[in-house]
């Protein structure tokens, strides 16, 4: 039996938070352009923000809808393509989002959702040479495996280092 602490205690609050995050990250999508810096020797230096590329996103079990939407919206607004492993115990919010993605203006194949056991999927995702970065918000027990499997192609890795995230907090992202 799954612990009730994995589920959001207030589903309505989770849904409202999810909608707020979608609007927040949608507004950020056009605000990450580059800048021109004046160099001290009468020259210009151009700074461009570029997407990572193909990112693997591993979602936690806590607040499955809010965490899924927050993670994909943040990565997608930067121009990345995503391979998302949703919550292992509660994948239905992510799976239901398939229908919304298909009928929305989200470019095809920019969000790919793969459900299954995290033990099996994380190693495959980490070893894949076409994945440029891994964003792990899943269980911290996978951090060592992600590090080991990602060495061959030097992909970028971001993890929460065992910390817990309050996905429903009103902290501005």
Set out the residue ranges of the language-model regions.
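Conserved nucleotide-cofactor-binding alpha/beta core module
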Residues: 88, 95-112
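Aromatic/hydrophobic pocket-lining residues that form π-stacking "cages" and hydrophobic walls in ligand
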Residues: 22, 71, 97, 146
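N-terminal Rossmann-like NAD(P)+-binding subdomain of aldehyde/semialdehyde dehydrogenases
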Residues: 1-44, 74
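Ligand-binding pocket scaffold of soluble enzyme catalytic domains
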Residues: 10-14, 18-23, 29-30, 54-57, ...
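Short beta->alpha linker loops
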Residues: 1-6, 13-17, 88-92, 116-117, ...
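Substrate-binding/gating loop at the entrance of the active-site cleft, primarily
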Residues: 37-95
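Conserved NAD(P)+-binding/catalytic subdomain of aldehyde/semialdehyde dehydrogenases
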Residues: 12, 42-45, 49-59, 104-173
């Amino acid at each position: 039996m799954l612990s009730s602490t994995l589920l959001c205690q207030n589903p309505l609050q989770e849904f409202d938070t999810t909608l707020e995050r979608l609007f927040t990250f949608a507004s950020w999508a056009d605000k990450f352009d580059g800048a021109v810096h004046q160099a001290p020797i009468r020259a210009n230096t151009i700074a461009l923000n570029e997407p990572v590329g193909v990112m693997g996103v591993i979602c936690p079990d806590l607040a499955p809808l809010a965490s899924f939407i927050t993670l994909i919206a943040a990565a997608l607004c930067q121009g990345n393509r995503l391979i998302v492993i949703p919550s292992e115990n509660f994948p239905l919010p992510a799976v239901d989002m398939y229908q919304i993605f298909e009928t929305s203006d989200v470019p095809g194949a920019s969000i790919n959702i793969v459900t299954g056991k995290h033990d099996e999927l994380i190693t495959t995702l980490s070893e894949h040479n076409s994945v440029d970065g891994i964003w792990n918000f899943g269980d911290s027990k996978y951090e060592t495996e992600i590090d080991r499997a990602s060495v061959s192609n030097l992909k970028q890795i971001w993890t929460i280092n065992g910390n817990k995230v309050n996905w429903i907090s009103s902290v501005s992202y």
